[in-house]
Amino acid sequence: MVAIPLRIMTADAHPVFREGLAAILSAQSDMALVAEATDGNQALSLFRKHRPDVMLLDIYLSGMSGLDVIAKIKNDFPNARFLVLTTHTGDAHVQRALKAGASGYLLKNTVRRYLLESIRAVHHGQRRIPSEVASNLVEYITAEALTAREIQVLGQVANGNANKIIADRLSISEDTVKAHMKNILSKLAANDRTHAVTIAIRRGILELDAVAS
């Protein structure tokens, strides 16, 4: 009896990377690539059409983020399996992906080493987080998380705004902004405002697109 191959779908903005994934998958007798999406909205639509066994996707997709794609699909298809493939190593990125419903999180530069085993494991209901990713989680596992308001304040700092402007934009007092900044520096073990922004971006607490907006 011939085994039915795993039906795989990919979602990534970069055509060269998608082509690489397609080449790897095509060499496997137990896997078949059924769809490729280039943005978040297309990913959602193609998933509903093809119902793949495992979806490989990046965090950052135009139109709708990869994490939103996962959350929306999980809402309608609780048993859907997702494996995130990305360049982002921050612990906050990983935590958000797992919370959204991803079962695995791989860095793109480790795909050749871990991809096939991870796909098979995720399909069987297991989680796959390689040591390169897990080490970041472990490093900050006891760190106190920033509150939503603290992230708002730090985002304003990242855009170069002074305390008075931040206070006006968030409808709070300058003293409150200063208190938030004191907490932020302490939680991130940062030396100053710039250092805090750098740490937050590296860890994925602040998103680059949000900083630029």
Say what each PLM segment does.
Residues S186-S213:
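Basic, Lys/Arg-enriched C-terminal extension of HTH/homeodomain DNA-binding domains
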Residues D39-Q42, S65-D68:
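Acidic catalytic/metal-coordinating carboxylates
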Residues I4-F17, L21-L25:
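Conserved acidic segment of CheY-like receiver
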Residues D58-I59, T86:
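Active-site residues of response regulator receiver
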Residues D30-T38, L46, A190:
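Short hydrophobic/Thr-rich beta-strand motif most characteristic of the beta2 strand and flanking loop
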Residues A92-K99, S103-Q152, I205-L208:
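Short, flexible helix-to-coil linker/hinge segments that flank and couple to helix-turn-helix
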Residues A162-H195:
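Recognition helix of helix-turn-helix DNA-binding domains
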Residues S62:
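The feature encodes the CheY-like receiver
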